[in-house]
Regions:
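Active-site cores that bind ATP or allylic diphosphates and position pyrophosphate for catalysis
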Residues: 8-216
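Histidine-anchored nucleotide/phosphate-binding helix
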Residues: 2-3, 105
Length: 216
């Protein structure tokens, strides 16, 4: 990032960088607030800030009784149900960049941070587009997919990422993907009871039983 022209890079600790959007954004805003940042700029599919602000305010003060009643259906569905009275906002929670942007704004409000949220409309491929495009910007999903398939930096990848990124990727001897890590997860699941798995962060609402059932 520094070689690409960024002035300062702040690390989001691994503990928070690997969490869901809510925890990710809480930690990120906390760091920015401490650094006295004035703006938080994020990409979004629509480039519209007003609807994202409306959703963030609704999520900041949800109907707690409603959430408790619907807990078994999961947080994503709860979020959608919370917006039933404002159906025009529901399409905005269907996109990954919108979801993170909403959580950034919610975190700013929750922490009373003097930070101005700004959004830039995403250009090029959508986040989940799986093919490299010849013009415009390719998605991170497409770049990762091709990198894991080819196991090297091809000319297509070179055209899709900054020069310094391509150089760093060329130095990697072994690209680790989920298939590489899955056997270790299998061992963990096989050697631990459901009650033990339940002690892990965000493993709740019976998901430990489903994990034991579907992972041999």
């Amino acid at each position: 990032a520094l070689h690409a022209g960024i002035d300062l890079v702040l690390e989001l600790p691994f503990l928070f960088a690997t969490q869901n959007a809510e925890r990710f954004s809480d930690a990120a805003v906390c760091i920015l607030k401490y650094m006295q940042a004035q703006n938080l700029v994020f990409g979004s599919e629509s480039g519209e800030l007003t609807p994202l602000k409306r959703i963030a305010k609704i999520l900041l003060h949800p109907d707690q009784a409603h959430f408790k009643q619907e807990r078994s259906i999961g947080y994503a569905r709860q979020m959608e149900n919370t917006l039933l009275n404002t159906p025009e906002l529901i399409p905005y929670i269907k996109h990954p960049n919108h979801i993170l942007g909403i959580q950034y704004i919610r975190s700013i409000l929750a922490q009373n941070a003097k930070i101005l949220p700004i959004t830039i409309q995403r250009k090029g491929s959508s986040y989940h587009h799986s093919e490299i495009v010849n013009t415009g910007f390719s998605s991170a999903t497409a770049i990762r997919k091709l990198l894991f398939e080819e196991r090297k930096v091809t000319s297509k990848i070179q055209t899709a990422v900054p020069e310094m990124t391509a150089k760093i990727l060329n130095q990697v001897e072994n690209y680790i993907d989920w298939n590489t890590l899955f056997p270790y997860l299998q061992i963990k699941v096989a050697t631990n009871s459901a009650n033990c798995l339940k002690q892990h962060l965000l493993v709740h609402e019976g998901i430990e039983n489903r994990i034991k059932k579907i992972i041999p």
